[in-house]
Amino acid sequence: MRVRWLRKALRDLDDEAAYIAADDWLAASLVVQRVIAAVGMLAEQPGLGRPGRVPGTRELIVRKTRYIVPYRVRVDSVEVLRVFHTSRRLPGRW
């Protein structure tokens, strides 16, 4: 199954990386690698995440980080909707 990142999700990941890199570029790189690796597993295991708070979505908790990746499973692809730090208040919709 193909994994497709929405623009908002890519922007979220880029913003988070920039924020972390201001203090520690190595930590930022590690977080990005972990998020990308975790999301990559969805191609083979789209049901990996828990049921999402927003109907019709699932949420992948990225191990060894404090990030949640909401996504939607389509017939032939997985859509990555956003990337959120767990300290943030999550929106009611994506």
What is the predicted role of each segment?
Residues G47, R66-Y67:
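A generic local structural motif
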Residues L48, L60, L90:
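Short clusters of hydrophobic/aromatic residues that line enzyme substrate/ligand-binding pockets
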Residues Y67-I68, R72-W94:
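Enriched for short, Lys/Arg-rich terminal
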